[in-house]
């Protein structure tokens, strides 16, 4: 099974979008928009569909970049995390999967965080990539 998550970064503020989950798995934890890739769907197609479902739209973006691919030990599950740079923060129109949202500075992690995202943000390689992305797209 494949799934995808997208970390929106506002070029104007340098902050990232998080969603507060309201679902059965890990309710009350903070995560990213995204979900399961349907049969016959591409990663990008699934990402766009999930964002439309969870945010009300897939916002216009400056750049879309793969950040990480996690594969479970048994090879059955893949989770693809992307960074999507948008010009400005936006107000998502949340569906019933989420209770709220927050735009936060990198390193200001919402708590409790979804365990998969927590594992990702604690990787030094991810911290380095995020810092590089922020530096590349930071407005003066």
Predicted segments with their positions:
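A short gly/proline-enriched turn/hairpin at secondary-structure junctions
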Residues: 31-32
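C-terminal lobe/hinge of AMP-binding adenylation domains
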Residues: 20-21
């Amino acid at each position: 099974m494949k799934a995808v998550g997208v970390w929106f970064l506002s070029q104007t503020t340098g902050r990232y979008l998080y969603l507060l989950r309201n679902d059965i798995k890990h309710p009350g934890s903070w995560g990213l928009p995204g979900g399961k890739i349907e049969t016959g769907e591409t990663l990008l197609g699934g990402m766009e569909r999930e964002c439309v479902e969870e945010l009300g739209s897939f916002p216009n973006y400056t750049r879309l970049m793969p950040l990480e691919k996690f594969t479970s030990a048994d090879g059955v599950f893949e989770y693809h995390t992307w960074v999507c740079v948008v010009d400005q923060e936006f107000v998502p129109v949340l569906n019933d999967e989420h209770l709220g949202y927050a735009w936060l500075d990198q390193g200001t992690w919402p708590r409790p965080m979804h365990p998969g995202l927590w594992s990702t943000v604690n990787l030094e390689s991810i911290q380095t990539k995020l810092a590089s992305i922020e530096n590349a797209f930071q407005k003066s």
